[in-house]
């Protein structure tokens, strides 16, 4: 039996900053991660230019999708403040 309200194309992703604070997002596997990044910034009040998003220690491109990165339900994206002191 097929569930019409199935979320089979969606996954839950958590973000975690350097202080251990987390946020939960539910997005389609084909949604560009820029949307998640923008939503994170809106919730946290941070400017997207001041942050770096990483998956398994590797930087994430705004145009990447969970599908492209082989992300699974429950994966965690790390969020770091960019070091702008010497840039």
Task: Indicate where each model-derived feature is located.
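Ubiquitin system architectures
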Residues: 1-87
């Amino acid at each position: 039996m097929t569930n019409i309200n199935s979320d089979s194309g969606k996954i839950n992703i958590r973000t975690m900053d350097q202080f251990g604070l987390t946020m939960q997002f539910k997005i389609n596997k084909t949604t560009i991660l820029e949307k998640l990044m923008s939503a994170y910034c809106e919730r946290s009040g941070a400017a997207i230019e001041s942050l770096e998003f990483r998956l398994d220690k590797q930087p994430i491109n705004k145009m990447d999708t969970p599908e492209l990165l082989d992300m699974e339900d429950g994966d965690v994206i790390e969020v770091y403040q960019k070091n702008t002191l010497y840039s």
